[in-house]
Amino acid sequence: LFAALFASAYTDRSFSALVRVTVDGDAHVIEKTVFYLDSEGEMRAFDYLLSQGESALGDWQKFSGNVRYHFLGPLSNLNIIAAREYSVGSSAASISLEYDAQGFFSARQMGVRTTRYELDASRLNLAPGKTGEFSLGNSMTIDMIFPEDAVNVEVRPEPGVQKTSYNGLSWSGPISGKWEVSFEREQPLSQEVTEFFSQLYLDATNSYALFLVLLFLVVVAFKLVKLRE
């Protein structure tokens, strides 16, 4: 019965993705697709899955082509949130995917204290056949937020991208193209000093331990010589 109901039509209303970049260059992604259920059968099918509490991603994908991973992996910690959107319309509904994407940005050491992060465009899967591109249709947006200590945030080319007040970038459709995105993080001088003295202490401790071992061997050798005499 429900297999037949799933075959009914839907109308996409909007798609949004929030990408929070971590200090490791990974990303925590929240995608939300809002759509209209265009028939009574589809509304019953959606409400049925909603009442089950937990359903597989494949079950929800039948309601909209936008319900899929728009960023490639390795991916982990998937959480699916489905809801009716009565504030939008009586037949509106939404499905959100929340997950972690590893290696979203590649990290490269630029100096003693500076690390540069560059977007790995191969992780983008926003439109079929356009891997590596920011390809967004009408009513589609992507917000990318960088770590609080990110500096020198750069995007090339700049046209088509809005810099936000919360240390991030925003793309709004319709738009299609390739952008290079990068930022830097600087290790605080205090942390560098702390790590220096910690390493110095560790080296000194290791040297002292080696000294004790050598001293022990010398004492043992001395006693063996005495015994032979």
Predicted features by range, described:
Residues L1-T11:
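Hydrophobic secretory-pathway targeting helix
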Residues Y10-L49:
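Early extracytoplasmic/domain-onset interaction patches
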Residues V21-G25, T33-S39, Y99-F105, A121-R123, ...:
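Beta-strand elements of well-folded, non-transmembrane domains
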Residues G25, V34, Y48-Y69:
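Non-catalytic, solvent-exposed interaction/assembly segments
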Residues S172-Q199:
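Juxtamembrane amphipathic/hinge helix adjacent to a transmembrane helix
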Residues T194-L214:
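Juxtamembrane/start-of-transmembrane alpha-helix segments at the extracytoplasmic/lumenal side
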Residues L214-E229:
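C-terminal membrane-anchoring or membrane-association module
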